[in-house]
Structures are given as C-alpha cells and as structure tokens.
UniProtKB/Swiss-Prot annotation:
Main location: cytoplasm
Species, as recorded: Mycoplasma mycoides subsp. mycoides SC (strain CCUG 32753 / NCTC 10114 / PG1)
Top-level enzyme category: transferase
Gene: rsmG
Record-linked InterPro entries: rRNA_ssu_MeTfrase_G, SAM-dependent_MTases_sf
Protein name as it appears in the record: Ribosomal RNA small subunit methyltransferase G
Family recorded in the similarity comment: Belongs to the methyltransferase superfamily. RNA methyltransferase RsmG family.
Stored SUPFAM superfamilies: S-adenosyl-L-methionine-dependent methyltransferases
Role according to the record: Specifically methylates the N7 position of a guanine in 16S rRNA.
EC number(s) from the headed UniProt entry: 2.1.1.-
Any one GO molecular function term: rRNA (guanine-N7-)-methyltransferase activity
The entry's keywords: Cytoplasm, Methyltransferase, rRNA processing, S-adenosyl-L-methionine, Transferase
Gene Ontology cellular-component annotations: cytosol
Length: 137
C-alpha cells in the first residue's frame, strides 16, 4: 500500500480523503495484477505509479476547476487521466474512449471493481467519434 500521501497535499483544487486513498490503492493493485495480460504500462513501481500516473493525471486541475462536468478521455489506455479524475471528482460524467479492445475490457473491469458510476466506455478510434458528438467537448 502507498504511504507517501503528502505528495497530494500541495494542491489547492482537490483534496484527498480515505475513500480516495482506498480507491487509488485498489486501482494500483488491479493495474499491476492485469498489466501483463493487457500491456497497460511499463511503469509498475508503486511510488512511480502514484507520482507519474495518478498525480500527473491531476495536474491540469490546478488550472481548471472541476465540479460536475462531462469529460471525455480519448485514448485513455489504462485510464489515465480519466479514472483518476473520476475518483477525485465522483460527480463528473466520464466517457473513456479506447480503440484497443483488450484495454477497453480492462477499463470495464476496473470501473466495476472501483464501483464508479456515470462512466461510459467506448471501444472506438477517435476518427469514429463523429456519431458520438454529444460526448465531445
């Protein structure tokens, strides 16, 4: 389990609580468990995942306030930044767009295990999104 939670404390537009910590820990466990099957990331060391994937997913939040927007994450791969944003901001409506079928299946599994609501996963390429205009911001 991750213990260096202080890295999340230097930011003004989000806070971290025990529920978020639990979900991030579970996300990491699932990511590592499923990584070999789905080829999700080459970064697998605990502290690196939390700093380079989870914390980096929140960097633009310092410039843009997030409350309950609709957010589309195109080419989300292992769910960065979309899933991390959803964990920190559960009121957003999130659409994850991933062309790789195996990674899209991983995302479905991850969303279920993390018990995230209002998440739609589209197994599509960006060029195919014209029919999904309502998802684009």
């Amino acid at each position: 389990m991750f213990s260096n939670w202080d890295i999340f404390l230097n930011y003004k537009n989000f806070t971290i609580n025990q529920e978020i910590k639990n979900k991030l820990d579970l996300y990491y466990q699932i990511l590592i468990q499923e990584n070999q099957k789905y080829n999700l990331t080459r970064i697998t060391e605990l502290n690196e995942v939390f700093e380079k994937h989870f914390l980096d997913s929140l960097l633009f939040v310092e410039q843009f306030q997030i409350i309950d927007q609709k957010i589309a994450d195109i080419g989300t791969g292992a769910g960065f930044p979309g899933i991390v944003l959803k964990i920190f901001f559960p009121n957003i409506k999130l659409t994850l767009i991933e062309s790789n079928n195996k990674k899209a299946n991983f995302l479905k599994y991850l969303v279920q295990k993390l018990e995230l609501n209002n998440v739609e996963i589209l197994n599509k390429r960006a060029e195919e999104l014209n029919e999904y205009k309502e998802h684009l911001i």
